[in-house]
Each structure stands twice: as C-alpha cells, then as structure tokens.
C-alpha cells in the first residue's frame, strides 16, 4: 500500500481513482499528475514501484496544494472574509448560504435541523 501526502492509497484500485482519495485531487488532476510522471493510469495502486511512488510524491509537493495545506488555506480564506466583515463573511458567521440561494424555505443543510414551534399553553 503506497502512502502519498499522508494518505494510504487503497489497494486494488486504478491509479486515477486511488489518487482521488487525497483531499484536493479529483479525476482530472489525478490524470494530469499520472501523465506528467509517466505512470500508466490503468495500473493498480498495489502494483506501483517505489520509484513511481516517489515521482508522484515529488510532483504533488512541487505543483499542488493538498491535504492539510489546502484545508488551512480554505479555512484562512473564510476567516479573512469574516474578519473584514463583508457580506460573504457575515453569511459564514451566521451559518447561512453565501451564494445567493433562497433561505425562506430551503437551506436546511446550513441552518441545521428545524426548531419546532412551541405548543401554546391552555389557559
């Protein structure tokens, strides 16, 4: 089992699929990485040689932000928006959608579960 960017690649998966287990790498990026390193994308991840693994690792470190670095950059970007007090930052702070979706009836994912209406007390 190859370990790249702190992630154990799954066994018996094609390399283009196995690389997508790394945060920040999708299918297109995985194919681009494999093409630049000269690794066959149909090859299984458990059939990689140590040289191929090292080439992929070097390519990732040199040209791509993945895993922790990417997560930190995303978090820092959201924090910056909240600090400068722009509209998107306020929406993030309040836990509401910030891309213009309606919130009257939808956006339950961002708002969380519904708060029920309290039953009126009988007098």
Curated annotation (Swiss-Prot):
The keyword Oxidoreductase does not apply. GO terms for molecular function: rRNA binding; structural constituent of ribosome; tRNA binding. GO terms for biological process: translation. It comes from the Bacteria. PROSITE patterns: RIBOSOMAL_S13_1, RIBOSOMAL_S13_2. Residues 97-123 are annotated as: Disordered. Keywords: Ribonucleoprotein, Ribosomal protein, RNA-binding, rRNA-binding, tRNA-binding. Pfam families: Ribosomal_S13. One of its GO terms (cellular component) is cytosol. Part of the 30S ribosomal subunit. Forms a loose heterodimer with protein S19. Forms two bridges to the 50S subunit in the 70S ribosome. Belongs to the universal ribosomal protein uS13 family. HAMAP family: Ribosomal_uS13 (MF_01315). Located at the top of the head of the 30S subunit, it contacts several helices of the 16S rRNA. In the 70S ribosome it contacts the 23S rRNA (bridge B1a) and protein L5 of the 50S subunit (bridge B1b), connecting the 2 subunits; these bridges are implicated in subunit movement. Contacts the tRNAs in the A and P-sites. This is Small ribosomal subunit protein uS13. It comes from Solidesulfovibrio magneticus (strain ATCC 700980 / DSM 13731 / RS-1) (Desulfovibrio magneticus). The gene is rpsM.
